Amino acid sequence: GKLPVTFYKDTAELPEFTDYSMKNRTYRYMEMEALYPFGYGLTYGTISYSGAKTEQETSAVLDDVTVCTKVKNESAYPLHESVEVYVKYKNAQPDEPGFQLKGIACVELQAGEEKEVSVTLHARDFAVITEDGGCVVRPGEYEISIGGQQPGERSRALTGRETVILTVRKEGNEENVEY
């Protein structure tokens, strides 16, 4: 399975209860290295990813974006894999979140089997919450990570695997979306 929480290395790294800023809270705002990051998990065999792509590299701000990848079970026995899709606004402000889990696809693979997996991201998946509580999608570039874990150095060190980072561009004006 995959972790639904982040494990800090030490309790001293946890923010004070009286500090309500998001800095270092949850995997989305963490600046230090986690002991075990959100989404981390191992399996009894080897899973490989290949051919990651988006169906559209440029789209209107409110359009859906579909990402696809091939997932292969390199083992001699059946496995389940959770394909994780994270999104990050490339020009995010320092107080805005980094990569956020926005899609997941669970796939069952027989020994040696390969399947193509698609995840569709909607406008809300690209949105950010503003200071005044609005929910907006901005034009600009977004990074989409697809793989079996959260993107980042610690995940790589623990699993020996990389995620693929794709870039898509949203064009048009900033748009409000439902929270």
Identify the meaning behind each predicted range.
Residues D125-E141:
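Short glycine/proline/serine/threonine-rich loop/turn segments at secondary-structure transition edges
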Residues P78-V85, P97, T130-D132:
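Short, hydrophobic/aromatic beta-strand segments
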Residues Q93-I129:
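Intrinsically disordered, low-complexity Pro/Gly/Ser/Thr-rich segments with frequent PxxP/GP/PP motifs
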Residues D125-I129, Q149-R154:
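Short acidic/polar inter-strand loop motif in beta-rich domains
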Residues G1-H80, Y86-K88, P139, E143-G147, ...:
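Secreted, periplasmic, or luminal enzymes acting at the cell surface/secretory milieu
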Residues E55, G103-A105, G133:
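Short, conserved secondary-structure segments in the cores of folded domains
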Residues A105-V107, V117-L121, R156-E175:
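Generic detection of short hydrophobic beta-strand segments and adjacent strand-loop junctions
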